[in-house]
Amino acid sequence: MHPCLVETESVSLLQEEITIITMASSTFPTVNKCTSIGREKHTVVADMDGTLLIGRSSFPYFALIAFEVGGVLRLLIYLLASPIAAILYYFISESAGIQVLVFASMAGMKLSSIESVARAVLPKFYSSDLHPETWRVFSSCGKRCVLTANPRIMVEPFLKEFLGADMVLGTEIASYKGRATGLICKPGILVGDKKAQVLKKTFGDEKPDIGLGDRVTDAPFMALCKEGYIVPAKPKVTTVTSDKLPKPIIFHDGRLVQKPTPLMALLIILWIPIGFPLACLRIAAGSLLPMKFVYCAFKALGVRVIVKGTPPPPVETSKTNHQSGVLFICSHRTLLDPIFLSTALGRAIPAVTYSVSRLSEIISPIKTVRLSRDRATDAAMIKKLLQEGDLAICPEGTTCREPFLLRFSALFAELTDELVPVAMVNRMSMFHGTTARGWKGMDPFYFFMNPSPVYEVTFLNKLPKELTCGSGKTSHEVANYIQRVVASTLSYECTSFTRRDKYRALAGNDGTVVEKTNKANKVMGC
């Protein structure tokens, strides 16, 4: 018999077997009836949308890829294609609807760019939508498999790194010369019987212990498991908190603050033509006006600056009195931290940075000095700047969006005893003003494109003399103490993570870039 006929016959027999089993198991108990005790040696197979995740739609996650890789125009194309996808999905073919979403969001994109977004951006949004009952069962099993219609390249980093999945069976997208074509590899979109076929091919005669799904089309693969449970649609279910995940999400990237639902995606597209000119106006006000007027200008333009604590008065320094300026030790949220510090003080405070883009240097209203990464050179430069007046530094070396403080570099503590900790925190409703993967020159524009961004600057008490290096404390003791004080003020958690940890997690490098000849290596800051 011809091999193709044998393969066709095998597929037909498998489909018949699946149909018979599905008819015999047309109803499954709900997931809350599944015990999670004694499952350490069991294998679980779970669907993703509507099962592991509360939301049943994958629209927001494809929208994130469209925006983060292709920009606002690609998001617009994707949004225009979504009604077609919805009609196909609900009235003609589930797989055809998903195919349209894949094509509209990924066609022509580099696979490496899609993988980068999947690793650095999507986990934050996926983790905020985790179903508590499904996670209770899924996390209790020793071997975890996810079977999903979503492209594997899109979901695998989150499932394996943050949920501890051992195996991810997803739709495979086709590519040409490293770029996604928008088409799907065989056997196609994994829905209905195709899920069951892939599961049967992967596990063979071995039956997984638990199958978890949320819709009728999941019944074929659930019927191949020893136990099957349905996850009912309950939109008001409380999501799993981050502390219950095997690995907390400390670092994440991407420009969007909120999950881009269809309505939110439309608002983003409509707002950007308004928000960008508004951002330019706000930046111009901060750059061109005297610093003592910037606070009022920001307020008039919708940027709120909240000042807490008592700012120290300016220190009169000169070559004769040898008095050092105050060194402001700031927690690092965006590259705008020193600018909002200056706004709160009403005077320009120079800042040392690990590297900012040339555009950011041009539009900055304050003096910025780059660190060289050579300890002796940087120490001499900071001492010189302190002799000229007050100075700001962010010893974390890079930004962190979550309520954590990274390790403080101890160099600053060796250079002066005039230390004032400053707790910085900001609130944005639409765009993040930081990036690890994109061009940092756009960071201030994205921050000021938010409709009403907020910056809160809290001045803490000046460090007592007995807690400085001048009184016998080591620089590491001083740095760790200031980190704890700032973290306590913000209700943040101290960590020992560094800039290198962040960039390895988000960008796949250690955060350093090679500068042009005759220039020292600079660190990608912020």
From Swiss-Prot:
Membrane topology of this protein: Multi-pass membrane protein
| Region forming the signal peptide | none
Motif residue range(s): HXXXXD motif: 332-337
Q: What is its EC number?
A: 2.3.1.15
Query: What is a GO molecular function of this protein?
Result: glycerol-3-phosphate O-acyltransferase activity
**Catalytic activity annotated for this protein?**
sn-glycerol 3-phosphate + an acyl-CoA = a 1-acyl-sn-glycero-3-phosphate + CoA
Give the UniProt family note. Answer: Belongs to the GPAT/DAPAT family.
The species this protein belongs to is Medicago truncatula (Barrel medic)
What is the protein's name according to its record?
A: Glycerol-3-phosphate acyltransferase RAM2
Looking at the UniProt entry, the stretches that span the membrane are 72-92, 98-118, 261-281, 283-303
Please give the record's induction comment. Answer: Accumulates in roots, in a RAM1-dependent manner, during colonization by arbuscular mycorrhizal fungi (e.g. Glomus versiforme). Triggered by RAM1.
Q: Could you tell me which pathway this protein works in? A: Lipid metabolism; glycerolipid metabolism
